[in-house]
């Protein structure tokens, strides 16, 4: 685990998973039974290999095993890949959860 991941866990209770393909980070919103995806990043040369989908599968499996009812994420509208990212999430049955200035929040039920 990197120092940055340790810092985020200690100070913000954010769990980080890193492997040779990239990383993702999650935060538990216990009072809402929701697991929030804080960040997900895949190495550029691997982005056509469905690594993000594999990460989502791991996140949803963890959420189901730990009693979460929903998984959420936010997309920063100023990210140069925002349109593509939103389209992919919405195409995979994520629903609009909220908007917050520069971000759009998405939610998906855990089944």
Describe every region a protein language model picked out:
Residues 1-4, 111:
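Conserved N-terminal entry element of GNAT/NAT acetyltransferase domains
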Residues 5-23:
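Conserved beta-hairpin
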Residues 27-30, 44, 98:
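Short, low-complexity Ser/Thr-rich regulatory SLiMs
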Residues 32-44:
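Conserved acetyl-CoA binding element of GNAT-fold acetyltransferases
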Residues 42, 48-61:
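Conserved acetyl-CoA-binding loop-helix of GNAT-fold acetyltransferases
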Residues 63-77:
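Conserved GNAT acetyl-CoA-binding A-motif
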Residues 77-98:
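Conserved active-site alpha-helix within GNAT-family acetyltransferase domains
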Residues 97-111:
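C-terminal "cap" of GNAT-fold acetyltransferases
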